[in-house]
């Protein structure tokens, strides 16, 4: 990857405590799973370098605390994000029902330049658990995504490494596209209106 321009992309992972955000992040970056992770305090992050469309991309993945008492810290971590990953546990209906509040809070705190097109992705985690324990159907999750601008959806298992790599490949592409679109928008700044009197010149020939 030497010689290629590198892009740093900030990705925020949000969801209720216990849905598996830390496990998903560690499975993606380190290809490891542990059932003994402690609840994240505040926020933590890992980085991974990948190649996306012949571009070297460093993903900075922020794993944020799912407890309400840490949500006030959001503005410090969310600003400058290029993509947001929403995670819920398919076996926990409450974790699905609170997704909108996480999404709305992110948009308020992060203040992206174009909230309507800012890239989100939804992960339904812990699909390795027995089917009879499942509380949120795939069709319900897809309906949620469709109603919010066709958000990409993956059903994942951090434990079994199901769809984790595939999900973050999509994250990297979405984040890179968002960064590129922001760069283009920045090139089209407001026109500068000059005082016409100051532009008048005289030529004495």
UniProtKB/Swiss-Prot annotation:
Keywords: GTP-binding, Lipoprotein, Membrane, Methylation, Nucleotide-binding, Prenylation, Protein transport, Transport, Vacuole. The gene is ypt7. The keyword Repeat does not apply. PANTHER family: RAB FAMILY, RAS-RELATED PROTEIN RAB-7A. A motif (Effector region) lies at residues 37-45. It comes from the Eukaryota. Ypt/Rab-type GTPases are key regulators of membrane trafficking and intracellular vesicular transport. They act as molecular switches that convert between GTP-bound and GDP-bound states, and regulate virtually all steps of membrane traffic from the formation of the transport vesicle at the donor membrane to its fusion at the target membrane. In the GDP-bound state, Ypt proteins are predominantly cytosolic, solubilized through the interaction with a GDP dissociation inhibitor (GDI). Its main location: membrane. Belongs to the small GTPase superfamily. Rab family. It is found in: Vacuole membrane. A lipid is attached at residues 203, 205 (S-geranylgeranyl cysteine). Rab activation is generally mediated by a guanine exchange factor (GEF), while inactivation through hydrolysis of bound GTP is catalyzed by a GTPase activating protein (GAP). InterPro entries: P-loop_NTPase (IPR027417), Small_GTP-bd (IPR005225), Small_GTPase (IPR001806). It comes from Schizosaccharomyces pombe (strain 972 / ATCC 24843). This is Ypt/Rab-type GTPase ypt7. One of its GO terms (cellular component) is cytosol. GO terms for molecular function: GTP binding; GTPase activity. Disruption phenotype: Asci produce less than 4 spores, which are immature and germinate at low frequency. Cells are defective in development of the forespore membranes. GO terms for biological process: endocytosis; Golgi to vacuole transport; intracellular protein transport; positive regulation of vacuole fusion, non-autophagic; regulation of vacuole fusion, non-autophagic; signaling; vacuole fusion, non-autophagic. The modification Cysteine methyl ester is found at residue 205. GTP binds at residues 17-23, 33-40, 66, 125-128, 157-159.
């Amino acid at each position: 990857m030497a010689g290629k321009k590198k892009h740093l992309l900030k990705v925020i992972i949000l969801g209720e405590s216990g849905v598996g955000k830390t496990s998903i992040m560690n499975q993606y970056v380190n290809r490891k799973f542990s059932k003994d992770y402690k609840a994240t305090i505040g926020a933590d992050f890992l980085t991974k370098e990948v190649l996306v469309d012949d571009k070297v991309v460093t993903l900075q993945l922020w794993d944020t605390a799912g407890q309400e008492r840490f949500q006030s810290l959001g503005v410090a971590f969310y600003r400058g994000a290029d993509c947001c990953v929403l995670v819920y546990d398919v076996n926990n209906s409450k974790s699905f029902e609170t997704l909108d509040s996480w999404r709305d809070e992110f948009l308020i705190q992060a203040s992206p330049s174009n909230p309507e097109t800012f890239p989100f992705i939804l992960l339904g985690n812990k699909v390795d658990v027995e089917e009879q324990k499942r509380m949120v159907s795939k069709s319900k999750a897809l309906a949620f995504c469709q109603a919010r601008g066709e958000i990409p959806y993956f059903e994942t298992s951090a434990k079994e490494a199901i769809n984790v790599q595939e999900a973050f490949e999509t994250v990297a592409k979405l984040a890179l596209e968002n960064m590129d679109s922001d760069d283009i928008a920045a090139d089209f700044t407001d026109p500068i209106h000059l005082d016409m009197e100051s532009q008048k010149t005289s030529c004495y020939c």
